Amino acid sequence: MINKMYAWRGYAGTHRLEEDNPNRISLSASDRGEVVGTVTLGIDSPVGLLADEIFKDQLDHFRDMGGKLCEITKLAFDPRVRSKEALAALFHILFIYGRRIHHCTDVFIEVNPRHRRFYETMLGFSCLGEMRTNPRVNAPAWLLWNNLDKVQEQIERFGGTSSHPGNERSLFPFFFSQKEEEGIARRLMSIG
């Protein structure tokens, strides 16, 4: 699915999930048994993050301040599926893994300029530095950042309110409620 979606967007390279990498967690969303979306969370380690290839200077700033970093990579979602709930569920579970299970403080994502506004508006990311070329996909990329405590505040405030989101235009109302998050986090921690 990743190669199909990336090729459709004109990105170069072969993209595969790294099942044998203990610092990467890949999730998928299914609809009636068919995978409709996938995303990977990379946890910082001595080998670093994929974003270090072009944004190491910016990531090192957060490391130097004592941050524990993670990154979102390999997001692919079937464009025929218009489900904010499915997309929000994938992101919420990623944030649970990052913050609650791996105790990360900061999350990063490299995005094509055409997707930057989505992440800023829908998930509260902020742009860092200047645009650079990502050699893994041979395309321009921005490095976006979000503080996971800030993400958690938004989840606590808006999660589970999609039936009455008010003026909130982000994905956070489609995230799980706090009670649902607690149950999911307990189950994820119990399986290791």
Residue ranges and their predicted role:
Residues I54-K150:
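Acyl-donor binding region in acyl/amide transferases
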Residues V36, G48-L50, V81, F118, ...:
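Intrinsically disordered, low-complexity acidic/polar segments
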Residues R32-F62:
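Short, His- and charge-rich active-site/binding loops that engage polyanionic ligands
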Residues M1-V36:
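Short amphipathic alpha-helix that is part of the acyltransferase structural core
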